[in-house]
Amino acid sequence: NLNQWMLKITAYADRLLADLDKLDWPEKVKKMQADWIGKSYGAEVDFKLENSDEKITVYTTRPDTLYGATFMVLAPEHAMAKSLATDETRADVEAYIQMAANKSSVDRLQGKEKTGVFTGSYAINPLNGAKVPIWLSDYVLADYGTGAIMCVPAHDDRDFAFATKFNIPIIQVIAKDGKEIENMTEAYTEAVGTMINSGEWNGMESSVLKKEAPHIIEEKGFGRATVNYKLRDWVFSRQRYWGEPIPIVHCPDCGAVPVPEDQLPLLLPDVESYEPTGTGESPLAAIDE
């Protein structure tokens, strides 16, 4: 891992969204920008591990479907990924983690064929006490949400494909007109419906429960309402002389020191040549000032 300077654009996520309305841009482009920022409302839910006081926190935009969570998936880079492996699964888990490390995030998200490995461990659904098998899969990224998701295959296409491939139970919890589908051949992803197979939530409208569930979960003490963003801080990697100057001075005594605000913007001096020298030195290395 390399230390990198980053532009903390996530701190401006809400302003970036709000100010899209001030731009004289095509609506299509503004929608693309909004989708890129990706603001979502949901909940973080704590699942305790079976026979343990440890817990895994997942982020979900659909806490109303918690009764339908039949498995959990962690990113292979998740801090607990290796420790969840049992003696029987450890070799497969470590091999899968290594395989995922060799893929880019783009490759992982675009992969049509879902891959994964069962850790051998279980979490406990905090609503109904059901055992939830914990899997690793590279379609979950460590830097989005908590790096762990609860999976509701009856109502998510990706989860449905994963559950079908690995023979994981599928429990429908939202139904059109309250009628359960006898043989599901695809996920029911309609935005509205009536809650079924959901204990005390049965009969509620899913659109209403979606808004109320984060606060119910918070009151019960195993989660909290949360806002999340797809937007990530911007890494300034492979920065060169012709790039944006980063206003940080490297002091031999004090370390990295920010340039005072009254001295901004930082302008680089003119140089005779800014092309690579072949020695790895910066074009600024020859400047005596």
Regions found by a protein language model. Give the residues of each.
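Catalytic alpha/beta core of large soluble enzyme barrels
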Residues: 78-177, 182-183, 187-188
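Nucleotide/phosphate-binding sheet-loop regions of phosphoryl- and nucleotidyl-transfer enzymes
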Residues: 3-10, 67-96, 174, 190, ...
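Short hydrophobic-aromatic micro-motifs
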Residues: 7, 58-59, 66-74, 132-136, ...
